[in-house]
Amino acid sequence: MRKSIVSPSNAAATPIGELWRDLERIARVEISSEDESFPIEHALSRTVTGGWKAATTGPQLIRLHFDEPLAVKRLQLHFVDKTSERSQEFAVFAGAGAELKEIVRQQWSFSPQGSTEEIEEYTVNLSGITTLELKIDPDRSHDPKQSQSYASLQSLKLA
């Protein structure tokens, strides 16, 4: 056993807000649709808020292609729906090139009378990824072709 006695550091820890990556600068994004009032930049920005919303109903895709291979230790997804009663499912995939592996899959039920916000934060160990993909099915209670719900994303953050 190697042991050292050290004095506590007076330096403050770096706030997590400063650790989130600047996705607008390091990635190119592909989306399946976009409401012009809620562009994807609003969900990926570290400064702008307002989130992204799909222009069409049913399942949607957000795919990030990174300029350089990336290591990711934390992933945060934030969804908000204050008006609809619905069950949503999302899945995150990541990898290099066409080889993507599922990282997480999660379902959530929104209700205007209570459950209006979902924030999921995951500790991951991804290295050398060039692509991150988010698939959102905004309404698990219907056949995707019959869904009347619009997918939305308040924010996506990586550290």
Enumerate the language-model features and the residues they cover.
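Short, surface-exposed beta-strand/strand-loop-strand elements in extracellular ectodomains
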Residues: 85-98
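Short solvent-exposed loop/turn micro-motifs enriched in small/polar/acidic residues
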Residues: 55-57, 85, 115-117, 149
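Extracellular carbohydrate recognition and processing domains
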Residues: 101-125
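Short amphipathic alpha-helical segments embedded in low-complexity Lys/Glu-rich regions
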Residues: 91-93, 108, 149-152
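A cross-taxa feature marking solvent-exposed loop/turn segments within ectodomains of secreted
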Residues: 70, 83-87, 127
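Extended, low-complexity, turn-rich repeat/linker tracts enriched in Gly/Pro/Ser/Thr and Asp/Glu
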Residues: 79-88, 142
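Disordered, acidic Ser/Thr/Pro-rich linker "stalks" and the adjacent N-terminal cap
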Residues: 1-65, 82-84, 157
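Hydrophobic/aromatic beta-strand segments within beta-rich folds
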Residues: 29, 61-64, 72-78, 119-149, ...
